[in-house]
Amino acid sequence: YTRASDFVEQIAAESRKLLEKGEAYQTDQGIFLRIKQEEHGKLLGVDLEESLAQGTSEVDSGPKESPHDTLLWGPPIEGGKIWEFEGLPPGRPGWHLECTLMSSSELDLPIDIHWGGVDLIYPHHESEIILAEKIGLENYCDFWMHNGLMEDSEGKLSKSRGERITLEEVFTDCPPP
């Protein structure tokens, strides 16, 4: 199985390269990729401001130059693993670059179909596309597919919050015609 921890050194190296090229900047909250207006909107076909309005994921503005900038290398999390590499502050990988590097290393490029929930379009998948281009992975993916989300009266069901429903439960409550 592919493990994110096997890619931490590569994530650190790419973060450092982007920082050295001036494509990224460092704050006390990590290293962020600068995202320019013209680099954005490949999936949604809209500008940065419209992406925020159409995205279903929250974007943390934090200590960034722009709320659209992507975390490449984050600060340590209390109780979490901390990695140390030359040229980077002690910390942890950002998940957008992590996914870009893992998929490009494990799959033949271009990736035929990259799939995820609609909540991943922005900022995650938009960030993956931009990152792939910035690190030299032209023609990263041919097709992007996004499925809808299961919701109840309180919003999106989330496994990470312990909200799980089986098909058996769905069919008990809502039998097929």
Predicted stretch roles:
Residues 1-6, 147-148:
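Acidic carboxylate-rich catalytic motifs and surrounding loops in phosphoryl-/glycosyl-chemistry enzymes
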